[in-house]
Curated annotation (Swiss-Prot):
Record lineage: Bacteria, Pseudomonadati, Pseudomonadota, Gammaproteobacteria, Candidatus Palibaumannia
Alphabetized NCBIfam families for the sequence: 16S_RimM
Assembly and binders: Binds ribosomal protein uS19.
A GO CC annotation given for this chain: cytoplasm
The name this protein goes by in its record: Ribosome maturation factor RimM
Keywords, comma-separated and alphabetical: Chaperone, Cytoplasm, Ribosome biogenesis, rRNA processing
Localization (cell): Cytoplasm
Principal location listed in the UniProt entry: cytoplasm
HAMAP family the UniProt entry points to: Ribosome_mat_RimM
Coiled-coil segments: none
Entry's family note: Belongs to the RimM family.
Domain notes: The PRC barrel domain binds ribosomal protein uS19.
GO MF annotation terms: ribosome binding
Amino acid sequence: MPVNPVVLGTISSAYGISGWLNIISFTQNAASIFEYQPWFIKKLNTWLDVILDEWKYNYHNKLIIKINSIENREAAQLFANCNIIVDASQLPTLSDGDYYWKDLIGCQVETINSYQLGKVIDLIETGSNDVMVVQANQQHSTKINELLIPFIYGQVIKNVDLATHIIKVDWDPEF
């Protein structure tokens, strides 16, 4: 059972009749999900260790896996919509200024003038830079529910303090 669980993907559905499963990887390079072992699945409030027998790309170039002891479609369907989970200790240590999204979600966002903007609830990958989705605090609630703030370190993001869960930004609260 993972001490600090991190979702790296999801099992979407059964594939074929021999117990294979379609998966969706949340890692930047889809096949990188296989570098993190062991996998865990939480099913009916019980943690299960996943023993991966094999993985490959199907003819649609989508990832499929074969889990030990799943031999038919009916057994595979029981795992549909389960998250693929690893322990955070398996993730590589990042260099200064790089952050895992999981660590940013839940942080409070405030301006360099200490104005409370809200809490990070999601991040969006846009290609040029990531964007924080910030649930606006009550001061904004009559006008805006969510703020989209680009995660551009130095220009917009001035400081990330994971110990206090505060992200300081140079951002106009009225924008």
